């Protein structure tokens, strides 16, 4: 089922900024359409295009965990910053844009720009007449621009980004970006004007080059951007792509492209009595497919839409593994798009040699652990070290592997991917844990992202609840994995039994650490990891219920002054954990109204200055878009321990409204379709993709199915019979 029309992106131009642009993407390339119609700008990005070169000043020889622990215990903030945080202020390594095209010769004046999510085709019109259609073809690095005959004479020009020669002085840094593209020492590009093609070839570093080319064929214009290990190969591949596109022709390319999207949207859908939530969900699913294509680089902070304002992308467009990557890839499984999300797991798997190297070199341990702020090769970028170098963030990456197994039921993936990844991570953490005076295992130092920023107070008394929840999750899940694979030996259970219980205050719920509670509003709810996203506490358990209620109530009491965009989706999930659909709906509406650009991009701050938080900046990152979609799904479907419940957090205002969804994925690959009509009739259909048994909470019965089998149920609400 295609997305409803109100979920499309409809804008009135001229579009003044790149982060408000019409966003096209196919997981290989991304394009942003913006500016005045007579000089329309098309920003082009290539998935995985990085300037990998390290600066001449290498990481300090004391860039080690042992030194970090020593400085933390001394309270030496200045030296900690010098060694571990300073590297992040350097401009490289960084994600970089590929360049931009300018389409000249279209009429001046205002215009209507629309992105049809169902087909991923953009159209631009004036006075009701379409003057441009555009798409990025799924499966190939090619964009197509289609014009009516009236505008046959338009021209297309190509420009490289405003890379400098490395001599320009850096502007004063800030917490978001270390400066402009002018700081990057890149050689001049080579221009291409042969065979009707125009563009350039750009060497980036010793490992990377790319080409941006376009060709005008009557009223159709094709463009491509390709990266390779050298200029010659990038040039050859780009020319082949353009020739193949021209040979196939725009209409055939468009037909293939539309078929791909029709199949994609057929995998899941929903219909809600709330257009805002529908829009959040459908746009997030569009961003997922547009940004994450099997065989290509996974989405960094901005996906395939790198900044095009002359500056380095926000936070260098890196991979932040202390929240951002995990939230970016949190919703895809329930949405029944496992192929798009597995891109990130395949990427993490490919980095295992680097993770082992980093565990040895930085932590001095066996096993594997990636830095929490890293470049595309898994190299440490620095940053506030209590978070950017926290070893427990690696466990959050482990959870992503287990969630894939949990929601697909793929036993081979459990055996060949999940178990090895967990075991290698545990080998690193096990060496770092030390036995305290009470016999409990603690880390040498502990923190809770990003409490107390990078001040001395950010080093909490071990173990913080953030670290402790993740450690419990790691060893407890290893016990479950061994049981599921039939080789239980009790080793991991023995380690988990030596971890202290979570620190709880009767008034405020989950604490930051054994001796500190959260006393002020903060964007990260890292102390509440045990509730969400680890789901270690259950509202069905009376003791857990009191902890969940106290924790969430305390966060509400502290207010949203220091929240950012992702905080609202996270709070929605915390409300859903206690079946508070009204609370979840409230937070998702606040997020949608105050933190999204008009094209759906999440801009982190209350950039409209509406008063919902103290941050008024607008750096674009995608993770909160996906987190909000995840919260929408959790309002509709709960799937834990093979118990399935539909509408576990239904807002009061939906009680007499139609609600439906199709093929949302539950545990062990069970696909759930559900409909409730306004007159109280409920229809539930479950389809197994794996053999298994599930308890259906709404019908109070177990169902046992073999792969491919379907079972349906119907019932009426008691008060409407």
Provide a role label for each language-model segment:
Residues 2-381, 441, 483, 489-559, ...:
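Aromatic-residue-lined binding/catalytic grooves and analogous aromatic/hydrophobic interfacial grooves
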Residues 19-49, 54-55, 67, 316-339, ...:
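C-terminal capping/lid segments that line or modulate ligand- or cofactor-binding pockets
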Residues 81, 342, 415, 419, ...:
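Conserved positions within tetratricopeptide repeat
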Residues 128-132, 137-142, 403, 407-413, ...:
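A conserved hydrophobic secondary-structure block that centers on an alpha-helix together
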Residues 300-318, 366-416, 430-493:
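The feature captures the catalytic groove of carbohydrate-active enzymes
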Residues 324-327, 393-404, 417-431, 567, ...:
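Extended, hydrophobic alpha-helical segments in both membrane/secreted and soluble proteins
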């Amino acid at each position: 089922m295609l997305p409803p029309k109100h979920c499309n992106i409809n804008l009135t131009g001229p579009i003044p900024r790149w982060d408000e642009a019409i966003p096209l993407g196919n997981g290989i390339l991304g394009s942003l359409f913006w500016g005045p119609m007579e000089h329309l700008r098309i920003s082009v990005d290539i998935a995985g295009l990085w300037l990998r070169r390290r600066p001449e000043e290498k990481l300090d020889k004391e860039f080690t965990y042992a030194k970090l622990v020593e400085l933390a215990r001394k309270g030496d903030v200045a030296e900690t910053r010098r060694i571990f945080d300073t590297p992040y202020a350097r401009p490289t390594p960084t994600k970089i844009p590929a360049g931009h095209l300018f389409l000249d010769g279209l009429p001046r004046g205002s215009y209507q720009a629309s992105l049809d999510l169902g087909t991923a085709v953009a159209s631009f019109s004036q006075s009701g007449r379409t003057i441009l259609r555009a798409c990025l073809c799924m499966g190939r690095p090619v964009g197509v621009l289609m014009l009516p005959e009236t505008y046959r004479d338009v021209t297309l020009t190509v420009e490289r980004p405003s890379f400098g020669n490395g001599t320009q002085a850096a502007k004063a840094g800030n917490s978001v970006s270390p400066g402009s593209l002018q700081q990057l020492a890149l050689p001049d590009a080579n221009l291409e004007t042969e065979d009707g093609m125009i563009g350039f070839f750009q060497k980036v570093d010793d490992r990377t080059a790319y080409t941006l080319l376009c060709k005008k064929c009557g009223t159709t214009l094709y463009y491509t951007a390709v990266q390779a290990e050298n200029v010659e190969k990038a040039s050859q591949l780009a020319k082949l792509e353009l020739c193949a596109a021209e040979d196939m022709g725009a209409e055939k390319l468009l037909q293939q492209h539309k078929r791909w999207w029709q199949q994609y949207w057929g995998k899941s859908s929903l219909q809600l009595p709330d257009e805002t939530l529908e829009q959040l969900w459908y746009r997030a699913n569009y961003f997922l497919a547009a940004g994450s294509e099997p065989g290509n680089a996974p989405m960094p902070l901005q996906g395939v839409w790198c900044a095009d304002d002359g500056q380095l992308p926000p936070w260098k467009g890196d991979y932040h593994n202390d929240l951002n990557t995990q939230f970016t890839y949190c919703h895809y499984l329930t949405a029944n798009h496992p192929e798009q999300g597995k891109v990130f797991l395949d990427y993490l798997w490919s980095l295992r040699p680097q993770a082992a190297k980093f565990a040895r070199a930085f932590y001095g341990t066996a096993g594997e652990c990636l830095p929490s702020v890293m470049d595309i090769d898994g190299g440490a970028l620095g940053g506030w070290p209590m978070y950017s170098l926290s070893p427990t963030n690696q466990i959050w990456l482990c959870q992503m592997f287990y969630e894939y197994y949990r929601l697909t039921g793929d036993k081979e993936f459990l055996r060949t991917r999940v178990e090895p990844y967990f075991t290698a991570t545990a080998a690193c953490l096990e060496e770092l844990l030390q036995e305290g005076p009470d016999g409990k295992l603690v880390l040498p130092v502990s923190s809770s992202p990003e409490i107390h920023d990078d001040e001395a107070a950010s080093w909490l008394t071990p173990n913080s609840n953030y670290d402790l929840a993740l450690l419990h999750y790691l060893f407890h899940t290893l016990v479950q994995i061994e049981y599921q694979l039939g080789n239980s030996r009790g080793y991991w259970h023995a380690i988990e039994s030596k971890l202290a219980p979570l620190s709880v205050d009767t008034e405020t719920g989950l604490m930051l650490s054994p001796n500190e509670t959260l006393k002020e509003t903060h964007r990260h709810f890292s102390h509440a990891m045990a509730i969400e996203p680890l789901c270690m506490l259950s509202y069905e358990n009376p003791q857990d219920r009191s902890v969940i209620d106290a924790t969430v109530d305390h966060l509400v009491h502290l207010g949203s002054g220091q929240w950012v965009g992702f905080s609202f989706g996270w709070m929605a999930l915390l409300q859903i954990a206690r079946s508070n659909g009204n609370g979840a709906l409230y937070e998702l509406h606040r997020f949608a109204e105050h933190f999204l650009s008009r094209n759906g991009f999440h801009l982190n701050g209350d950039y409209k200055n509406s008063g919902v938080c103290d941050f008024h900046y607008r750096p674009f990152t995608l993770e909160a878009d996906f987190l909000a979609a995840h919260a929408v799904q959790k309002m509709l479907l709960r799937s834990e321990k093979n118990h399935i419940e539909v509408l576990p957090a239904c807002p009061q205002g939906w009680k007499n409204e139609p609600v439906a969804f199709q093929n949302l994925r539950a545990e062990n690959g069970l696909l759930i379709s559900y409909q409730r009509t306004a007159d109280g009739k409920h229809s539930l259909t479950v389809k197994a993709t794996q053999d298994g048994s599930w308890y259906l909470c709404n019908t109070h019965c177990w169902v046992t199915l073999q792969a491919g089998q379907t079972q349906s149920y119907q019932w009426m609400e008691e008060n409407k019979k």
